[in-house]
Amino acid sequence: MTIYTITYNEELMLPYFIEHYRKRFPNCKIVVYDNESTDDTRAIAMGMDCELITYSTNNKLSDSTYLEIKNNCWKGQNDWVIVADCDEFLDIWESDLENEQASIISVEAYNMVNIEDNLDIYGITHGVRSTSYDKAYCFNASKIHKINYGAGCHSCSPTGQVSYSKKKYEARHYKYINIDYMIARHAIFASRRSEENIQRGFGAHYAYPPEQIKQEFLTARKNAIKLL
């Protein structure tokens, strides 16, 4: 199993991401594509024995570069791979894949919501259903020729021996961690949107005003159900 992720200033989430997948796949290789983080992301990746690959977009958030990486980073592998953002935790184990005949894992995803006003990731137990995150995170690279992710990897048009698992595995997207943290992250990403992203409408939600972000968070908290 090889796991690929893309990071920019993910010092909060990256340790949890690595621990989550190493627990499920003890011998996995984790490859971190880092977009020149300015916090401790790079040190964390190297300190936790990940392969670190740095790429530059001139300090701009570039969805086209993001897609180029995710559509190609796994090529050349002959086993299962996971391609996920640092806040996307697929709940699947090594034993689940040992006898899986399908080439792509089916997913039922939830946006995780912190009911408390803290940054305790392990304490987040609630979520709201999010069909847009039913992504093709996990697939068998020996059977898939191209994954052909679309914008944000929310859709894909794979080629090769394409078959989806009958069982759906839960994916947890840690979106609503903390109101202040979410507002601050949105502001950072809004300031980094490339001209291409702006013209194509990619990442438009990052430009939402703080009050709108807060209300979105509180609505999610109100509707969240216990998952863990």
Model-inferred region functions:
Residues 63-68, 92-228:
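Catalytic-site signature of metal-activated, phosphate-bearing donor transferases
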Residues 1-2:
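Cell-envelope/extracellular polymer assembly enzymes that use nucleotide-activated donors
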Residues 5-19, 36:
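Active-site beta-to-alpha loop of glycosyltransferases that engages the nucleotide-sugar donor
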